[in-house]
Amino acid sequence: MAGHSKFKNIQHRKGAQDKKRAKVFTKLIREIVTAAKTGSSNNPENNPRLRNALTAARSQNLPKERIDKAINSANDSSNNENYTEIRYEGYAPNGIAIIVEVLTDNKNRTAAEVRSSFTKYGGSLGETGSVNYLFNHCGVIQYPINIASNEDVLEAVIEAGGHDIISDDTTHTIYTDIENFSKVLAFLTGKYGIPEDSYIGWIPLNTIIIDDKEKAEKLLKLVEVLEESDDVQRVFGNYELSDDVYEIIQGEP
């Protein structure tokens, strides 16, 4: 999401990386288990969601033994661990729309945690559907900028069936329709290897520029707290930090 990559860069420098990595692995494993359980097959060739989950796991270097364990767990009939997919929507301060996607084994616990986080940082949790009209629901695939030229990647995206690409100084970001996401991801993975990131998400139609340091820090803290939950898979918002505010926050110890 707009502003989100900058936030992740800031946290990469500040955060306790082992702890963060463990949480990322937990989220990936939940998606693998859910995909394997809910799909028509445990074979990724016949289960697009599982195939996509495995690609995402490999992009984050989730060890193969943990991937295999997650799939075996999903196949175990005695395993009663099931996760429910829920989308929470609300507003952060200053009218910033936030979408929170979760996989949870306890809906009441997660709802209370998400609501508490919104309230604590000056936001308000709304009904499902209250802000999603401000976003485009689509597939997102990201490669480092040096994987190929913008023209070459664009040609590959068109051939694969994607519908847009935006390239900046560091990243090629490819957008796809949801129904084409798995096909485009498989095509690009075959051509360029495992992407840096790939997911179906909510991309803002327009962004609100945050040009005040205090407002930015409060917003980023809300996003950080939400993302710290093992239940939360991803957080999306329609904001972007101004260059000045981003540089100030990035420079803080």
Swiss-Prot record:
InterPro entries: Integrase-like_N, TACO1_YebC-like_2nd/3rd_dom, TACO1_YebC_N, Transcrip_reg_TACO1-like, Transcrip_reg_TACO1-like_dom3, YebC-like
GO-annotated biological processes: regulation of DNA-templated transcription
Keywords: Cytoplasm, DNA-binding, Transcription, Transcription regulation
GO cellular component annotations of the record: cytoplasm
Keyword Glycoprotein: no
Coiled-coil region: none
Organism: Rickettsia africae (strain ESF-5)
Compartmental location: Cytoplasm
The protein, known as: Probable transcriptional regulatory protein RAF_ORF0717
Region (Disordered): 1-21
Taxonomic lineage: Bacteria, Pseudomonadati, Pseudomonadota, Alphaproteobacteria, Rickettsiales
Pfam families: TACO1_YebC_N, Transcrip_reg
Family note: Belongs to the TACO1 family.
SUPFAM superfamilies: YebC-like
Molecular-function annotations in GO: DNA binding
Domain of life: Bacteria
Signal peptide from the UniProt entry: none
